[in-house]
Amino acid sequence: VNVQQGQPVPGARRTGPSRSGGVLALLLSALLILVTACGGSEDKKGGGTDPDKQPSQASVTITPKDGAKDVATDGALKVSSSRGRLTSVKVQDDKGNPVEGKVTGGSLWQPVGKLRAATTYKVDAVAVDDQLRESARHATFTTLVPENTFVGRYTPEDGQTVGVGMPVSINFTRGITDPERVQQGIKVTAEPSVPIAGRWFGNDRLDFRPEKYWKPGTKVTLDIDLKGVEGRPGVYGTQTKHISFTIGRSQVSTVDVRAKEMSVVRDGKKIKTIPVTAGGPGTETYNGQMVISEKHEVTRMNGETVGFGGEYDIADVPHAMRLSTSGTFIHGNYWSGRSTFGSRNASHGCIGLYDQRGGGDSSTPAAWFYANSLIGDVVTVKNSHDETIAPENGLNVWNMSWEKWRSGR
């Protein structure tokens, strides 16, 4: 009988498989198992599992360990990789501010500066091995809480309206040995925007000013973020402040010592001329641009506090406004005869304006000038035989050129 493949055999029953068919099925099954087994063996010889699914040989180590407390702010943070190279290291403080770092040799990351004290940091790092397989690590830690601290005492105050000559001046309660790090935590901006630069005087004072006097109406903002900043070894800042102040109208007064008079110019127009008495022989008034830093309706002036011994001690000097740290004021004077003003320089270096004792008479020149002056107004003195006042003697920053101011030297 001729049998074609796939055709039924004539006369054969279809109720079940034949004996020969069963044997054939068993043989085919055995062959399939053998082929499958051989195929599996060949796969192993060819490399087995996909290399991309193998774990990375690179390892990432973050120091300090996750959850660490009281971590030092300098030298403690390191991220390293063995059997691989670092491809990403991200460190942020609890405000989301990034920490700048540097990778050495592809396997060691360290911050370029010091961390802040009493601050929580988050670290995320990734490394790859020679097959570019990634390994990642995450950690958080908190830096130490300092025992020794400092703050900056600033002027002007928040919300104050001041004159066009007012700098931002910050005096620190401790001497600063890392001024660059501290200055990074302080920002002064203005609207409308102008270039503003800071300059240090000694190790405990930092002032900011624009190139020229502020324009009237300018809004100035001071942001201080010194929390955890190490200003000197083992001494950390604790301060976060946001203040703003406004520049009022422009008023610049000029005292001509030779002429013994003061011209008051507001918004470019002379509004008043006032006779004065300035420093006499041997106690001349400084020349230069001086900024009103304090106002006192009545104050005591004692010569012993400024090196004049017992030459004077006046308990009730009216309408006094400070122009220097060393003791220069522009103030009311009731003890000299009225004829002195405009005719003779007889003070110990201050600028005197005629006034009444107690300062109750609002019609006197001293009362008028006091009522019409702001902290931050400029009083310029010229034609005196004394030297120009130093920029750090008071808020008198305008006695330094912009080029020198910006140079920091």
Q: PLM features: what roles do these ranges have?
A:
Residues 155, 251-259, 399-409:
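Short peripheral tails and domain-boundary helices/loops at the edges of structured domains
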Residues 234-342:
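Gly/Pro-biased beta-strand-loop elements
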Residues 127-129, 226-228, 268, 298, ...:
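Short, charged beta-turn/beta-strand-edge "cap" motif at the junction between a beta-strand
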Residues 61, 78-80, 122, 169-171, ...:
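Soluble periplasmic/extracytoplasmic beta-strand elements of cell-envelope proteins
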Residues 164, 303-409:
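Exported/periplasmic cell-wall-interacting domains
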Residues 2-35, 39-249, 276:
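Acidic, low-complexity Ser/Thr/Gly/Pro-rich repeat segments typical of extracellular/periplasmic
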